Amino acid sequence: MSAVTKRSGSYGRTLGVGAVLVLVLATLAVVNVYTNLAPEMSGSQQSMLLSGLVSILLIVAVALLFVATIIGRERTAAVETLAAQARQIEQGELDVDLATNRTDDVGDIYRALAVLRDSEQLDRQHGVSAEVVAQYCETAVEISNGNDDSRLEENVDDPQLAELAMRFNEILDQRKRDAEIDSR
């Protein structure tokens, strides 16, 4: 069982304990009302009072069950969705949509997860950029050693590095053309 499932289960248990506590308090109130009023009533009135109080208690129990179910399902569904999105990010899928309008703690977790995802995207981009820069340095060394056929890779994800490579390659091409003209 994952930590997220344990926590959502814990939340459900807390909600259930709260509902049971309210039901116990309502039962104690019903018993208190009945024990205070029943001695002064006739048998049929006592029966009607008991019937009415039991009906009220049942209505409270059903209402609590309904509210607990609705709140629990909504909360559990939100946590399960968030857990699924976190698993996608964990597996490397960084294009997961984490936009939310929630203002509760689940919304806070969504926003925190979005920050982590964005940070991972930047780290990946910087890693790729660092690789490209290292390749560019190697190519520059080759060119300085006389390899006029070396070129910088223009097909990279970073638009600024692609622009740099294109312009650098244009300069090399022009230099090569000028050298050919001078050699004639």
Swiss-Prot record:
Keywords: Membrane, Transducer, Transmembrane, Transmembrane helix
Transmembrane segments annotated in the record for this chain: 14-34, 52-72
Induction: Expressed constitutively throughout the growth phases, both in presence and absence of white light.
One GO term of the biological process aspect: signal transduction
Pfam families (alphabetical): HAMP
Record domain HAMP: where: 73-125
InterPro entries: HAMP_dom
Primary location class: membrane
Membrane topology summary: Multi-pass membrane protein
Coiled-coil portions: none
UniProt xrefs under SUPFAM superfamilies: HAMP domain-like (SSF158472)
GO CC terms, sorted: membrane
Function according to Swiss-Prot or TrEMBL: The HtrM-Xop2/SRM complex may interact with CheB or CheR and modulate their availability to Sop1 or Sop2.
Subunit record text: Interacts with Xop2/SRM.
Further remarks about this protein from its record: Is lacking a methyl-accepting transducer domain found in all other photosensory transducers.
Name this polypeptide is given: Probable sensory rhodopsin transducer
Organism: Haloarcula marismortui (strain ATCC 43049 / DSM 3752 / JCM 8966 / VKM B-1809) (Halobacterium marismortui)
Classification lineage: Archaea, Methanobacteriati, Methanobacteriota, Stenosarchaea group, Halobacteria
